[in-house]
C-alpha cells in the first residue's frame, strides 16, 4: 500500500482533474468518485440539462481502460437494449439462450442509466441482481460483471409503495442537484471552449485494475472506533424517535459504514472518524422533507456531540455552579454592610456605601438564588449612583438580573444588620454580598477543573484539525464544527476570567 498521505494526495489530484470544466459539481464528482472507488451506487436527482450524464462519463476517466455504458430509459425499453441482444447463432445452432454482452452493461465498469424509474420490471429485476451480487445470468451461465459504479438519474423520485423502492434502496448515495447558481460560474460555463468529453486525467493519476482490487480489501480493514459507533447509534436512535424520519434499512446502514471506511481510507486514516459521518447526510434521506430532517440531525450531532462539545459545556456549567456555591459560602464574610447616617429622630433612616466600594457598577451576589421576574438570579448589577440615591432618599431601585438585559425593578431593603436584602414575590429574602477580591483569583479547585477542561478542549480541537482533511466533506460543514468548538473555548475563557 502506498503511504496513506500520498494516497490521499493522489485521490485529491484525481478529483481535481475530474472536476475541470464542471461548475458547482465538485461535491457530486467527489462523492461519485468515492462511490466508484468503493463499488457503490449513486442516484442523481435534478432537472434535465445539469450535467448528470457528464458526471458519469467523467468518472470513466478515473480508471485505466475502463469501459462505460449509458442508456436513457423509456417505458418501451427492453432488456436487450441494456444487457445485450440475444445471440441468434447460439439459439439457432445450439438452442442456447445467450446474450451478446459486449458493449452493454454486463461488461462495463461505469454505468449511467438516465430516467431510471421508467424501466420495466424485466430490466429492474436483472439490475437488482447486478447491483447486489455483481453477477449477470447469461443463459445457463452466471457471469461476474466488472461494474464499479452505477449512476442512476431522474428528475423525480420514485413513487412511494411502488415496485421501485427495492432499487431505490440500493442507491447508497443520493444527491439533489440544481442548475448553476453563481454568476461567475454561469459566465464561465457559457464561455468555456473545453471539450467536455476529453479525458482530463493524467495517466499517472488513473487507477489500475490491480490497485482497485487491492483497495477493496484494504477498505474493509479500516476500523470503526467505539466512540464513532456510539455517535452512529445515537443518530439512529434519534431518527427512530422522530415521527417524520425516513425508514433506514439495516442493509443501508451497513453499506453506509463501508462508505465511511472508504472515506477514511482515501483520506489517509486507519479508522473512521466523526467527520466521516457527515457523509450520512447524502445516504439516509428519502425525499425533500427527510433530506432537511437528516441534515438537521447530523448538524446537531456534529456541532454538539462529535467532539464532545455538549459534554464540555455540561462540565463547564457544573464548574460554574460550584464556583457560585463557593462564592455564596463566603457571602456572610463579604456581605455588603452599608453605613447608617443621621440621628434617631430622622424621619427616614439614611445609609451610604462603604468608602472602599468605589466601582461605578456594583455586582452583588445573592446568598441563595431567587426567582425574580421569571428568572433564576444569582447576582445583580447596580449602577453605583442609583444605589447611593436609593440608600439616601429611598424610592424605586432597579438592577440587571445576572448582569444581562434591562434593569428591573427590585424589592430591596436594609436589614437590622445593615445588610442589603432582596426579596422575591413571596417575600423570601437573600442577602447581597460583594464578590471576592479580584486579587484572590479563582479558587484552586475551580482553577484546576477549568485547566483540565481546557486541556480536554485542546485535545478535541487537535483531533478535529487532523480529521478535517477530508476531500469528501463540504467546507461549510467543517466551518460550523469549528465555530461550535470555538464557542466552547470562548465560554471556558470567560469562566477563567471570572
UniProtKB/Swiss-Prot annotation:
Tell me the organism's taxonomic lineage: Bacteria, Pseudomonadati, Pseudomonadota, Gammaproteobacteria, Enterobacterales
* Activity modulation comment: ATPase activity is stimulated by ViaA.
Coiled coil segments of this chain: none
Q: Which UniProt keywords apply?
A: ATP-binding, Chaperone, Cytoplasm, Hydrolase, Nucleotide-binding
Which parts of the chain span the membrane according to its record? none
Main location, first listed in the record: cytoplasm
> What does the UniProt entry say about where the protein is found?
Cytoplasm
For this protein, the Enzyme Commission number is 3.6.1.-
Gene3D superfamilies according to UniProt: 1.20.58.1510, 2.40.128.430, P-loop containing nucleotide triphosphate hydrolases
This protein's GO cellular component annotations are: cytoplasm
Pfam families in UniProt: AAA_lid_8, ATPase_RavA_C, bpMoxR, LARA_dom
Keyword Hydrolase annotated: yes
Family to which the UniProt record says this protein belongs: Belongs to the RavA family.
- Protein name, UniProt field: Regulatory ATPase RavA
Residues that hold ADP according to the record: 23, 49-54, 196
Subunit info here reads: Homohexamer. Interacts with ViaA.
Q: Name one GO molecular function term.
A: ATP hydrolysis activity
Amino acid at each position: 500500500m502506498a503511504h496513506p498521505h500520498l494516497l490521499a494526495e493522489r485521490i485529491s489530484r484525481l478529483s481535481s482533474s475530474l472536476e475541470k470544466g464542471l461548475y458547482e459539481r465538485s461535491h457530486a464528482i467527489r462523492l461519485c468518485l468515492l462511490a466508484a472507488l468503493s463499488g457503490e451506487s449513486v442516484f442523481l436527482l435534478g432537472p434535465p440539462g445539469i450535467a448528470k450524464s457528464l458526471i458519469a462519463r467523467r468518472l470513466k476517466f478515473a480508471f485505466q481502460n475502463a469501459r462505460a455504458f449509458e442508456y436513457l430509459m423509456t417505458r418501451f425499453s427492453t432488456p436487450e437494449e441494456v444487457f445485450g441482444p440475444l445471440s441468434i447463432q447460439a439459439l439457432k445452432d445450439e438452442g442456447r439462450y445467450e446474450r451478446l454482452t459486449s458493449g452493454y452493461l454486463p461488461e462495463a465498469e461505469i454505468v449511467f442509466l438516465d430516467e431510471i424509474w421508467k424501466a420495466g420490471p424485466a430490466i429492474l429485476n436483472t439490475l437488482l441482481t447486478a447491483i447486489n451480487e455483481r453477477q449477470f445470468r447469461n443463459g445457463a451461465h452466471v457471469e461476474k460483471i466488472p461494474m464499479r459504479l452505477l449512476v442512476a438519474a431522474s428528475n423525480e423520485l420514485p413513487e412511494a409503495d411502488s415496485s421501485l423502492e427495492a432499487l431505490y434502496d440500493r442507491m447508497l448515495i443520493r444527491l439533489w442537484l440544481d442548475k448553476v447558481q453563481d454568476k461567475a460560474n454561469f459566465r464561465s460555463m457559457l464561455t468555456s471552449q473545453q471539450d467536455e468529453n476529453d479525458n482530463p486525467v493524467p495517466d499517472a493519476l488513473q487507477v489500475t485494475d490491480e490497485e482497485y482490487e487491492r483497495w477493496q480489501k484494504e477498505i474493509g480493514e479500516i476500523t470503526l472506533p467505539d466512540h464513532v459507533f456510539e455517535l452512529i447509534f445515537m443518530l439512529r436512535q434519534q431518527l427512530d424517535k422522530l415521527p417524520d424520519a425516513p425508514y433506514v434499512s439495516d442493509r443501508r446502514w451497513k453499506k453506509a459504514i463501508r462508505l465511511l471506511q472508504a472515506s477514511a481510507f482515501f483520506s489517509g486514516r486507519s479508522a473512521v472518524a466523526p467527520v466521516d459521518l457527515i457523509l450520512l447526510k447524502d445516504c439516509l434521506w428519502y425525499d425533500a422533507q427527510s433530506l432537511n430532517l437528516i441534515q438537521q440531525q447530523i448538524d446537531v450531532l456534529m456541532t454538539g456531540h462529535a467532539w464532545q462539545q455538549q459534554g464540555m459545556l455540561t462540565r463547564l456549567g457544573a464548574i460554574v455552579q460550584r464556583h457560585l456555591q463557593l462564592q455564596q459560602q463566603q457571602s456572610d464574610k463579604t456581605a455588603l454592610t452599608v453605613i447608617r447616617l443621621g440621628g434617631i429622630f430622622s424621619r427616614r433612616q439614611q445609609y451610604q456605601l462603604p468608602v472602599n466600594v468605589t466601582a461605578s457598577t456594583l455586582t452583588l451576589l445573592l446568598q441563595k438564588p431567587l426567582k425574580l421576574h421569571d428568572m433564576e438570579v444569582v447576582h445583580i448589577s447596580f449602577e453605583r449612583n442609583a444605589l447611593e440615591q436609593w440608600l439616601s432618599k429611598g424610592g424605586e431601585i432597579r438592577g440587571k438580573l445576572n448582569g444581562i438585559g434591562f434593569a428591573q425593578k427590585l424589592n430591596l431593603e436594609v436589614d437590622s444588620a445593615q445588610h442589603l436584602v432582596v426579596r422575591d414575590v413571596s417575600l423570601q429574602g437573600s442577602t447581597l454580598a460583594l464578590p471576592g477580591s479580584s486579587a484572590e483569583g479563582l479558587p484552586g479547585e475551580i482553577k484546576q477543573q477549568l485547566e483540565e477542561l481546557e486541556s480536554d478542549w485542546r485535545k478535541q480541537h487537535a483531533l478535529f484539525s487532523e480529521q478535517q482533511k477530508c476531500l469528501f466533506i463540504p467546507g461549510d460543514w467543517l466551518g460550523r464544527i469549528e465555530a461550535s468548538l470555538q464557542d466552547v473555548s470562548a465560554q471556558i475563557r470567560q469562566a477563567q476570567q471570572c
